[in-house]
């Protein structure tokens, strides 16, 4: 009886834990990393190798919050020391040991239900740029989210870095560092920091991922009740529409699954310019194309007015 009483807290903790299952569908090995938020205990692992086709489960306790990412183009020696071409956490080891990913990096962010909340909150963020396609799916019918498009193959030249396994797509903030792109200073609130042409391009390709700092209404999802999560790198198909259970974006109507355009995570045309493809486009016009055309129309109108006024001055 005494032994049972000692085991009860352990059994309760196990029942409240969440399982994250990582699957690698990329053509090459990836090295997932984990970073716990401040005040949150670290997980049992902070980084590991995940070969092509492999799956690994990681447990997280109730109330855990943090982020996951995948490093690519890594070279580690037999003692586990080395570096990665993208999303390197700077630890010099397979384990990240409390360090986060260097941008550009695709991030899956979670805050699990705990004493202060009965809901899980989760999102996939491109705010720090993009290095790999990622899909997050929740058990129990809660909504999927992520970015299944290979943005590296369609990244604008001014945002593109690296090549091969080290290729990635920077955010406009990292590339240009200005307050309006980084939502800092006078732009540090939703009213003044608006989506740029670049963040609109990210949003057009991956409509349920964070595209800039204040993209909350369509990018943060919740799940009520116990749920486990699968995180797939380079997902090979777009998930179908499906019903959800108690799963919503934080400021939007209930979602019915997720449409991740572009199919497989390693598809796309080599060397295709994302900006050019959006400008000329195919199918229904996107908000990004409309925005670009609107800006061009305003510029043309302003130029015409200036020439007309100049002509009147000569007369």
Model-assigned labels for residue ranges:
Residues 2-315:
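Extracellular low-complexity, O-glycosylation-prone Ser/Thr/Pro/Gly-rich "stalks"
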């Amino acid at each position: 009886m005494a032994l049972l009483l000692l085991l009860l807290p352990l059994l309760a903790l196990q029942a409240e834990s969440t399982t994250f299952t990582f699957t690698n569908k990329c053509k090459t090995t990836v090295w997932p990393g984990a970073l716990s938020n401040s005040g949150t205990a670290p997980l049992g692992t902070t980084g590991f190798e995940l070969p092509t086709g492999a799956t690994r489960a990681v447990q997280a306790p109730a109330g855990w919050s943090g982020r996951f990412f995948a490093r690519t183009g890594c070279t580690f020696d037999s003692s586990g020391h080395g570096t990665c071409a993208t999303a390197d956490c700077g630890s010099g080891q397979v384990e990240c040991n409390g360090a986060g990913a260097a941008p550009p990096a695709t991030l899956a962010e979670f805050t699990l239900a705990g004493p202060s909340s009965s809901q899980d909150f989760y999102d996939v963020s491109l705010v720090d740029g993009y290095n790999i396609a990622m899909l997050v799916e929740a058990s129990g019918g809660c909504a999927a989210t992520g970015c299944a498009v290979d943005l590296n193959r369609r990244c604008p030249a001014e945002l593109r870095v690296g090549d091969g396994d080290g290729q990635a797509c920077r955010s406009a903030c990292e590339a240009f560092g200005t307050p309006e792109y980084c939502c800092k200073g006078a732009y540090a609130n939703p009213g003044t920091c608006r989506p740029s042409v670049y963040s609109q391009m990210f949003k057009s390709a991956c409509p349920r991922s964070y595209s800039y700092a204040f993209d909350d209404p369509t990018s943060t999802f919740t799940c009520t009740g116990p749920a486990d999560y699968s995180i797939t790198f380079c997902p090979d198909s777009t998930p179908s529409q499906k019903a959800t259970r108690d799963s919503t974006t934080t400021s939007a109507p209930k979602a019915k699954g997720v449409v991740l355009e572009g199919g497989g995570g390693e598809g796309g045309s080599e060397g295709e310019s994302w900006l050019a493809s959006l400008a000329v486009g195919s199918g229904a016009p996107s908000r990004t194309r409309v925005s670009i055309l609107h800006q061009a129309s305003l510029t043309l109108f302003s130029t015409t007015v200036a020439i007309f006024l100049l002509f009147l001055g000569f007369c």
